[in-house]
Regions:
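Auxiliary Fe-S-binding modules of radical SAM enzymes
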Residues: 1-13, 176-180, 187-329
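Canonical Radical SAM [4Fe-4S] cluster-binding loop centered on the CxxxCxxC motif
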Residues: 5-46
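A short, compositionally biased micro-patch
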Residues: 18-20, 112, 265
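Short, small-residue-rich loop/turn micro-motifs
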Residues: 19-21, 29-32, 121-123, 189, ...
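Glycine-centered loop/turn positions within well-structured domains
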Residues: 23, 126-127, 254, 280
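Residues that scaffold the ATP/ADP-binding catalytic core of kinase and kinase-like folds
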Residues: 24, 28, 74, 127, ...
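A short acidic, helix-capping loop that chelates divalent metal ions and anchors anionic groups
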Residues: 33-38, 103, 125-132, 194-198, ...
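Radical SAM/AdoMet-radical enzyme domain recognition
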Residues: 42, 48-65, 70, 74-188
């Protein structure tokens, strides 16, 4: 079991498979110049599967989410999914992706054992997409969403970040589109994890702003909430249901007290929180020949020291050096 001093138990593992991405979203990465992790520093496929095996069989992990960077850029992804699906007990498996590669991989991922996907899409307007991502790939994302739905990677969830002056007027339009295509839309407040360290709280679109915008077109009814942890979105029935929309207020209404996550970076570091300054090296233990029991002990010790909260409201808060692309969302 991965328990911390506040009694929280981690059952949800986020595994970053790469820090590389084929988009350059303005709230995540610079257009040029980001230093990639060196290939020898990255965990290989066997190391990733071994760590997931330890997490599932010895530490109580029930769900594994593959992230990046962009996880579809990982050459061995389908094989990793297939091997994790063969574990006993078998964890639930999901993937967070920009969707560009889903058209060619969705069916194979489903056959390998992937359960569902979350796809990032911030706008329905190709010109705004190009401005936000610095790439002209909007059509590829839309086609990837269709492929995921057709392959049965459902429910397909769409994650959207609204940025002032770019797409902050699109919330109702995005929700109408998601309802039409039977996707579950979730709006996420922009977090201080950009590589440029340019985030400012007073410049972000808040959960309150998003809900106000949505209510100009839809009737929203709060859905009965269970604990916010691996499912942190506050969910709202749209026009009485059955469709729902989620809002993840990581900044203005954080859910740290119910957090059930542990994170593994592409270079084998355990992180207790997206915003943590500290990391614990599992790669060194792996490569020095440590047995599974020792790796599990190191992991437990790392999670035991997890802080009470992210500290975004603390005047002394310092953004972590790693950007989101190198942590894994």
């Amino acid at each position: 079991m991965l328990i911390d001093t506040y009694g929280r138990v981690a059952t949800d593992l986020r595994v970053s498979l790469t820090d590389r991405c084929n988009l350059r979203c303005t709230y995540c990465m610079p257009e040029e110049g980001l230093q990639w992790l060196a290939k020898p520093d990255l965990l290989n496929d066997d190391e990733i599967v071994r760590l997931i095996d330890i997490a599932v069989t010895s530490l109580g992990i029930e769900e594994v989410r593959f992230t990046g960077g962009e996880p579809l850029l990982r050459p061995g992804l389908v094989g990793i999914v297939e091997r994790v699906a063969a574990l006993d007990p078998r964890p639930q498996m999901s993937l967070t992706t920009n969707g560009i590669g889903l058209k060619r991989t969705a069916a194979a991922l489903k056959a390998a054992g992937l359960d569902r996907v979350n796809v990032s899409l911030d706008t329905l307007r190709p010109d705004v997409f190009k401005t936000l991502t610095r790439r002209d790939r909007h059509k590829d994302v839309i086609e990837g969403l269709y492929a995921a739905r057709d392959a049965g990677l459902t429910p397909v969830k769409v994650n959207s970040v609204l940025m002032p002056g770019l797409n902050d007027d699109e919330a109702p339009e995005l929700l109408a589109w998601a309802v039409e295509h039977d996707y579950e839309l979730r709006f996420i407040e922009q977090m201080p994890l950009d590589a440029q360290h340019g985030w400012k709280r007073d410049g972000m679109i808040t959960a309150g702003d998003i809900l106000t915008s949505l209510r100009t077109r839809f009737e929203l009814t709060a859905e009965g909430q269970e604990k916010r942890g691996s499912a942190p979105a506050e969910r709202w029935l749209v026009d009485g249901g059955p469709h729902v929309v989620g809002v993840i207020a990581s900044v203005t209404r954080p859910f740290c007290s119910a957090c059930d996550r542990t994170r593994l970076t592409a270079d084998g570091q355990v992180r207790t929180c997206l915003f943590a300054q500290e990391e614990t090296d599992l790669r060194a233990a792996l490569r020095s020949g440590a047995p599974d029991e020792e790796i599990a002990r190191i992991w437990r010790l790392a999670m035991w020291g997890k802080k009470a909260g992210a500290g975004l409201d603390d005047p002394t808060f310092v953004q972590p050096d790693r950007p989101m692309s190198a942590i894994g969302g």
